[in-house]
Amino acid sequence: MREMLNNIGAYGEWAAGLVPDPPRLSYRKPGWASLNAWKAQARQRYLDALLRPESGGTPRATVQHHIEFDGLAIEHLSWQLPYGPPTEAIVLKPAGASGKLPAVLALHDHGGNKYFGTRKITRISQDVHPAMAAHQERFYGGVAWANELARRGYVVLVTDAFSFGSRRVRAGDLSDPVRRGLTEQNPEASDEIQRYNAWAEAHEHVLSKSLFCAGTTWPGVFVGEDQRALDYLCSRPDVDATRVGCGGLSGGGLRTVYLSGADPRIRCSCAAGMLTTWRDFLLNKAYTHTWMVYIPGLPRDLDYPEILGLNVPNAAMVLNNHEDQLFTVPEMERGTNMLTEIYRNAGAPERFQGKFYPGLHKFDRTMQADAFAWFDKWLRA
């Protein structure tokens, strides 16, 4: 009998069969002494698999400039991690706000565009790069969602992720065989940005393999960096560190899943356009996704949605699109059902919500309204 068509042909069902369902450390399996006992063992396994490199303590941020725009007080920050170029970040909150506010770490997407980072989900002036105006129109309903959330009474922090924006790999630092003719002579020019992004896409496997050779993983790097951003956010005098969340679309949804699984300081999360199963990646959709996703060895112990489940009973929301070209609907549904079961088994069914919307891969205004209401429910109540 011929196997169903899949990413790796005749090897597909064999490979899928290597992963037990449920996996070895799943909370969907009976026999755990307590929720806390499961979380301690499963989270430690997850953290061990990430192989996070040392990323320092709470970053010492420098304010590059402070402006007010569209009713928001905005700080443009930078800080230096123990490696790589400085990280640029944006903080937004309502102008004139006082006291400690709830806060959200807003995580930008991948989107096949490594030239940009924070600018994908923020606006700090009327002068918006045409590529970012188009990006926000395509994926976010034409708005900068970090601004929209800040306007509701939050301190919102957005940082350039590892290999994006200020943290991107630069042509001048590369050996000739890897550079492949890449230059950065007119960095804001649209044609040069397109060339950079095409180069960066082709460079992903080199970067990922190099990180493996360094004894770490791509998720381990960005989770560590997002935890340092969380350290900074929680240290701010205008932030109530007991009311902090995170969220994002696509690559930002991936970062939401992984950060929430690693760090219980995340009291509420919303992952948009990034909830499926390892089986979906393995058999159907790995070719559509970045190397940022993969954590070697972990699927035998935890399915992808169960990483987010490690943060139970803290609140979690996942938002999916029925026509999302990056996933299959049955596996999005199966992943959502896994989280429903985990939260039910933990006695906190009301703290998880999974929703589906019509349309392609996106986090549009309707989805944003639901996400913002979710943050309000758990961080502002």
Label each region the model flagged.
Residues 291, 337-338, 342-381:
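C-terminal catalytic histidine-bearing segment of alpha/beta-hydrolase fold enzymes
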Residues 1-73, 81, 117-118, 152, ...:
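N-terminal targeting or regulatory segments adjacent to alpha/beta-hydrolase or S9 domains
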Residues 99, 107-224, 235, 281-285:
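Cap/lid segment of the alpha/beta-hydrolase catalytic domain
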Residues 253-264:
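Short glycine-enriched nucleophile-adjacent loop
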Residues 312-327, 358:
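Conserved strand-to-loop "acid loop" that flanks and positions the catalytic carboxylate
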Residues 238-250:
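Alpha/beta-hydrolase fold nucleophile elbow
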Residues 201-216, 220-229, 268-308, 313, ...:
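Mobile cap/lid helix-loop segments that gate and shape the active-site cleft of serine hydrolases
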Residues 84-87, 94-104, 110-113:
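Proline/glycine-enriched tight loop/beta-turn segments at coil->beta junctions
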